Amino acid sequence: FNVGDEYLGKVKKYGYWRDTHLRIVGESVRSIQTRFILDWNQASKHQLILYDSAYYQAEPQGNVGMQIVSSGPDSDWEQIPDESLADAVKIAVLSGIDVRIMIPSKPDHPFVYWATYSYIGNMLEAGAKVYIYQNGFLHAKTIMVDGKIASVGTANIDVRSCRLNFE
């Protein structure tokens, strides 16, 4: 989903770039292809035409739910949770749920980085487990629930991503 030297680990400031990707097969590929063409046509002077013959022809793969969410304009990413997320984490922990959070050890934006730490302290006090990724830069936006449900995306868990950047 990302194109640039930093995503390949070629920028020394960040080192190894840790992200999460997944392989999608079946009918869901058609939804992604449509979303790509619509986004391309919105951003480019060279318009792509939607032809049925150009679409990926999928063989049925099974019955797994999937949701494709349209994205909005690109912007600088931040990692500052808001009060509602911090409160939700605290409530979950105090209810006996094992909450684990991983954040990068290297800042991309120092102000945002330290603001994140101010929220993390409260989550730690409530009993959440917080890990700091040391092997490079953590860019992944992944949520796992009980090893059965996953969310892999581009949105940060913060006010800008949830309310401003159409993520």
Short names for language-model regions:
Residues 1-167:
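Charged, low-complexity intrinsically disordered terminal segments
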